[in-house]
Structures are given as C-alpha cells and as structure tokens.
Amino acid sequence: MALTKAEMAEHLFETLGINKRVAKEMVESFFEEIREALESGEQVKLSGFGNFDLRDKNQRPGRNPKTGEDIPISARRVVTFRPGQKLKSRVEAANSGKK
C-alpha cells in the first residue's frame, strides 16, 4: 500500500479541520515548491525527514537486454533522496517488531 497525495489531503482535513479543497491545495503547493527548487538546481532539505539532491550521471555503456546490442546510456541529471537519521531510526524501530 502507498500513501497518496489524496490521503495526505484527507489527513489534513481530518486533523486540522480545514476545507478539503484547501487541504488538497496545500499538499499540491508543498510538492510544487519541492519540484521548483529541484528544477532550479537547488537541494531540498526537510529537517527530520531527509534531503533531495541532484546528481549528474555520466554517459556509460549499456546493453539492450533483448538483442544484446551495446548501446550508450546518455548522461543525465537525476534526483536522489537521502533519508535523515530521525526518519531512518523511526522506520527501523517500526520494522524491528515485524520480523
């Protein structure tokens, strides 16, 4: 199961008692700020959660799995996420009892 933006908006509606439309707009606005920062080359740091970074990957050799043909994989910029220590600790604590 995955947490969706709609579920986040519903949670805001239930916990803060704000209008559903406003809650949806808040969630959309939050993610739009992250998108815009990354598009302009900025790192996004969310204290207690983690960091979104941009990383440039060089061109590298690859192989078409169907034909076995060698093909170059283009250089590109990718978004990476590094969870913060608080998030790591909480996830580990939550999962330690499930084994």
Curated annotation (Swiss-Prot):
Keyword Transcription regulation part of the UniProt annotation: yes
Record-linked Pfam families: Bac_DNA_binding
Keywords associated with the record: DNA recombination, DNA-binding, Transcription, Transcription regulation, Translation regulation
Gene Ontology cellular-component terms listed: cytosol
Any GO BP: regulation of DNA-templated transcription
InterPro entries hit by this protein: Hist_DNA-bd, Histone-like_DNA-bd_CS, IHF-like_DNA-bd_dom_sf, IHF_alpha
Annotated region described as Disordered, given as residue ranges: 49-71
Protein's UniProt keywords contain Aminoacyl-tRNA synthetase: no
An example molecular function term from Gene Ontology annotations: DNA binding
Membership in a protein family: Belongs to the bacterial histone-like protein family.
Function in brief: This protein is one of the two subunits of integration host factor, a specific DNA-binding protein that functions in genetic recombination as well as in transcriptional and translational control.
Record note on quaternary structure: Heterodimer of an alpha and a beta chain.
Name of the protein in its database record: Integration host factor subunit alpha
Organism from which the protein derives: Shewanella frigidimarina (strain NCIMB 400)
